[in-house]
Amino acid sequence: MDLKITTLGGKDAGKVKLSEEIFGLDPREDILQRVVRWQLAKKQQGTHKAKGRAEIARTGAKMYKQKGTGRARHHSARAPQFRGGGKAHGPVVRSHEHDLPKNVRALGLKHALSAKAKSASIIVIDELKLTEAKTKALIANFATLGLSNALVIGGAELDKNFKLAATNIPNIDVLPIQGINVYDILRRGTLVLSKAAVEALEERFK
């Protein structure tokens, strides 16, 4: 699969050959869904907590005698049926993280890249570098390329000026190649890869 390379200014800078094994797969939604669920589960805080009846600051004494009142039998006012009582089977602090095999995670990344390639939503840029950290200038460059909602993936180290300039642009995410992931690829409309990022992906899945 051949894709043209452009500069940040929108000029032609040659072509790059993309591997069919990485960018040419038929995307499987089930694999993408598994990887996204795994990612979001890892991010979930899990700090939810409700007090059970054993944790309520209230006397544990029996409310009234067992027999002779004509009322329902009760023990402590900590029970869940009473106002201010403990929650029955309430949420507890826990980790929502679950395991996902490495080969499924790797396959998920390939399918996410292939999904973007299939929808013609990949742009390859020769290098992500700016002489000055000017957000206004970078917005103009993105407008030339037709980018309003994109994930930009650079090489192992991002250009400092480019990273600073892109920080305040809404709906634009910038990550080094180490940070590429399925969720961020799918949540943005366009995937922008630097030439160095393409080479790193080819090397990673070789």
UniProtKB/Swiss-Prot annotation:
It comes from the Bacteria. One of its GO terms (molecular function) is rRNA binding. One of its GO terms (cellular component) is ribonucleoprotein complex. The keyword rRNA-binding applies. Residues 63-94 are annotated as: Disordered. Part of the 50S ribosomal subunit. One of the primary rRNA binding proteins, this protein initially binds near the 5'-end of the 23S rRNA. It is important during the early stages of 50S assembly. It makes multiple contacts with different domains of the 23S rRNA in the assembled 50S subunit and ribosome. Forms part of the polypeptide exit tunnel. This is Large ribosomal subunit protein uL4. The gene is rplD.
